[in-house]
């Protein structure tokens, strides 16, 4: 890791040194009294790169005779007769659009639901709600339960509740806690809606949630490892020296 940091430092020092020298070189032409024309309307030996825009006689910015900025006769900025800045009859731009329904407002319930995944759920003692998952394909060892699961999988949760992985000593502890809280919350919510779960439902739901909790643990463990690796990389002395040097070049 240290050798890699030193090589990165040497590479960026060489690159930014060349960039710093380039910044100090004067730019030819284009300035005041430097011989170049910075404005398209002025003649130059090479011709005009930006020819003047417009339409027919007396048309500034295109349009018919006497039309500023295009549009019909007597229309400033385009639109129908008597329409300033376009719009329907008697409409001043986008204001006072008579007779048009207002735009639908975004439901705050939808916004809250979209931001729920990965956030701490209030009232559950620090548990977070995971992202939605596809329900796993599980074989339960007999045709009846396999068929029952296929026909009723929509009744089972597709998200799990969990705490951060650093609060557990191993995967089994995480999964056990995750299954218990998820099954409990889903059962209470479903019962409140007037539905009931049978013993078969509970058995199948525990298996399904267990697989989802294992997946959640793997995702959280990988994310925690990547965060730790990033902190370790940026805390190494060569990288700190490199960042300090880059800041010096940018500011200077």
Swiss-Prot record:
* Molecular function GO terms recorded: amyloid-beta binding; aspartic-type endopeptidase inhibitor activity; copper ion binding; cupric ion binding; cuprous ion binding; glycosaminoglycan binding; identical protein binding; microtubule binding
Positions binding Cu(2+) 3 in this chain are 77-79
Mind telling me which residues form the propeptide?
230-252
* Annotated residues for binding of Cu(2+) 1: 61-63
Q: Which UniProt keywords apply?
A: Amyloid, Cell membrane, Copper, Disulfide bond, Glycoprotein, Golgi apparatus, GPI-anchor, Lipoprotein, Membrane, Metal-binding, Prion, Repeat, Signal, Zinc
Where are the residues of the annotated region Interaction with GRB2, ERI3 and SYN1? 23-229
Does the keyword section mention Membrane? yes
Example of a GO cellular component annotation carried by this entry: endoplasmic reticulum
Record GO biological process: cellular response to amyloid-beta; cellular response to copper ion; cellular response to xenobiotic stimulus; intracellular signal transduction; learning or memory; negative regulation of activated T cell proliferation; negative regulation of amyloid-beta formation; negative regulation of apoptotic process
Locations listed in the record: Cell membrane; Golgi apparatus
User: Which Pfam families does this entry report, sorted A to Z?
Assistant: Prion (PF00377), Prion_bPrPp (PF11587), Prion_octapep (PF03991)
Spell out the residue ranges that the record assigns to sequence repeats: 51-59, 60-67, 68-75, 76-83, 84-92
Task: Give the start-end ranges of region Disordered.
Answer: 26-109
Which positions anchor the lipid (GPI-anchor amidated alanine)?
229
For the region 5 X 8 AA tandem repeats of P-H-G-G-G-W-G-Q, give the residue spans: 51-92
Which residues constitute the signal peptide according to the record? Answer: 1-28
Q: Which residues bind Cu(2+) 2?
A: 69-71
> Biased-composition ranges for Gly residues?
53-93
Per the UniProt annotation, where are the glycans attached?
180, 196
The record's Gene3D superfamilies line, in alphabetical order, gives: Prion/Doppel protein, beta-ribbon domain
Q: List the disulfide bonds.
A: 178-213
Q: Which disease is it linked to?
A: Found in high quantity in the brain of humans and animals infected with degenerative neurological diseases such as kuru, Creutzfeldt-Jakob disease (CJD), Gerstmann-Straussler syndrome (GSS), scrapie, bovine spongiform encephalopathy (BSE), transmissible mink encephalopathy (TME), etc.
Q: How does it assemble?
A: Monomer and homodimer. Has a tendency to aggregate into amyloid fibrils containing a cross-beta spine, formed by a steric zipper of superposed beta-strands. Soluble oligomers may represent an intermediate stage on the path to fibril formation. Copper binding may promote oligomerization. Interacts with GRB2, APP, ERI3/PRNPIP and SYN1. Mislocalized cytosolically exposed PrP interacts with MGRN1; this interaction alters MGRN1 subcellular location and causes lysosomal enlargement. Interacts with KIAA1191.
**Domain characteristics, as noted in the entry:** The normal, monomeric form has a mainly alpha-helical structure. The disease-associated, protease-resistant form forms amyloid fibrils containing a cross-beta spine, formed by a steric zipper of superposed beta-strands. Disease mutations may favor intermolecular contacts via short beta strands, and may thereby trigger oligomerization. Contains an N-terminal region composed of octamer repeats. At low copper concentrations, the sidechains of His residues from three or four repeats contribute to the binding of a single copper ion. Alternatively, a copper ion can be bound by interaction with the sidechain and backbone amide nitrogen of a single His residue. The observed copper binding stoichiometry suggests that two repeat regions cooperate to stabilize the binding of a single copper ion. At higher copper concentrations, each octamer can bind one copper ion by interactions with the His sidechain and Gly backbone atoms.
Q: What is this protein called?
A: Major prion protein
Q: Tell me the organism.
A: Oryctolagus cuniculus (Rabbit)
